[in-house]
Amino acid sequence: GSYDLSAHTVWLGDRTRQPDGAHVEFARHVRNPIGVKVGPSMKPEELITLLDTVNPHVQKGHVTLITRYGESKVKDLLPEHIKAVQNSKHAKAVIWCCDPMHGNTVTSPSDPKLKTRMFSAVVSELTSCLQIHASLGSVMGGVHLELTGDEGVTECMGGSMELSDEDLKRCYLTHCDPRLNYEQSLDIAFLISDVLKSQRRGIPVNNALSQALLRSNRVEGNP
């Protein structure tokens, strides 16, 4: 196969993952890493068929499964997808990545033209993914976040800055999807860091998350 030099990882989404479609046909012939978005509309058997198509030789690390359900659906859907992969030849070949952003996009209560995300919903889906993977003997190998290093951006609500709906218009700059700002991004980074450090010390994921969330709440000034 050849490389697609226009990108590093090329990915397939809900509208481009049809087994007989042009995008899948293209993806199966390139040597780039392949990302596959896995959401509520993806049936477990469809996921395995897609993996068989784009990674027939079961090359380890070639495919990253990017899960994006929304906080209200992740606990029902992610376990079934993990189990389907575990029962297939791809069990040890895929990389699992959590995208806690896209499934939690909502419209602003005060302005339906503005898309936003609740920081609490992002954290909820992220922590649910960590717990589910650990409970099933799987590993969450990555996190996909949309963020900016600009501290003043106000596109997502919540976090240590406690941004509200009224704050959104103050510095809403995105032309596409709402991003975590500098402080909100660090909130997430420190949470993940705390969990990983606790795991290295042999602390179970649930306990590690409880400790990390407690520290996070203290940083935000909550009782």
List PLM regions with ranges:
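Short acidic/histidine-rich active-site segments
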Residues: I95-G103
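Generic detector of intrinsically disordered, low-complexity, polar/charged segments
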Residues: P100, S138-V139
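Active-site-facing alpha/beta catalytic cores
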Residues: G1-E71, K113-S120, S124-S128, I132, ...
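A translation/RNA-centric and nucleic-acid-associated enzymatic feature enriched
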Residues: K83, V94-I95
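A short, acidic, amphipathic alpha-helical segment used as a generic capping/interface helix at domain edges
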Residues: D76-S88, V123-A134
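C-terminal structural cap/anchor segments
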Residues: T105, P109-L114
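Short, structured loop/turn "capping" segments at alpha-beta junctions
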Residues: K60-G61, K92-V94
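Helix C-cap/helix->beta junction micro-motif
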Residues: V30, H90-K92, L136
